[in-house]
UniProtKB/Swiss-Prot annotation:
PANTHER family: ENDORIBONUCLEASE YBEY, CHLOROPLASTIC. This is Endoribonuclease YbeY. Its cofactor is Zn(2+). It comes from the Bacteria. The keyword Disulfide bond does not apply.
Length: 169
């Protein structure tokens, strides 16, 4: 089983350059999937969309979907949470997990403030979004702490240093 990643580069107005190749994203998501897939419905393969964008687009999405008219770092739209009538999953079909949208502008600012690389920040945000696609949430401090610890595990699994958790709480 594997995860196919539809990588969309939509950060043309951003001043930051994404230091992560498409193949690296694919490797990371597949490694994270290996660690977390037992909780997913069975399928022959899985897919997700990762959209790297700028503050303008993510602010528009954040306003429309969350009624918060400002940029944010990451949004996740989990396909498995959508309440639509569907038949039981067919193990021979591709299962779409959802979409992750990351503002490269906000990630750049957060990496500078947290004194870690843009690569680490983008991976951290992608891991956070990926967990949301798999059903994780953080409605309270205890669940947020658990989710942040899981993100640390995911970053370590792909050989990235763990940013200081205090900068994310």
């Amino acid at each position: 089983m594997q995860v196919d990643v539809d990588l969309q580069d939509a950060y043309s107005s951003s001043t930051a350059q994404v230091p992560i190749a498409a193949e690296t994203w694919l490797t990371w998501f597949n490694r994270w999937f290996e660690l977390l897939h037992p909780s997913l419905p069975p399928a022959c393969s899985y897919e997700l969309c990762l959209r790297l964008t700028d503050d303008g687009e993510i602010a528009s999405l954040n306003s429309f979907y969350r009624q918060q008219p400002q940029p944010t770092d990451v949004l996740a739209f989990a396909a498995l949470e959508v309440e639509v009538p569907r038949s039981p999953p067919d193990q021979t079909e591709l299962l779409h997990l959802g979409d992750i949208v990351i503002s490269v502008d906000t990630a750049q600012r957060q990496s500078l403030a947290g004194q870690h690389s843009l690569t680490v920040e983008l991976a951290w945000l992608a891991a956070h979004g990926f967990l949301h696609l798999l059903g994780w949430d953080h409605p309270d401090p205890a669940s947020l702490e658990q989710m942040l610890k899981q993100q640390s595990i995911l970053l370590a699994a792909v050989g990235l240093e763990n940013p200081a958790l205090e900068s994310f709480i």
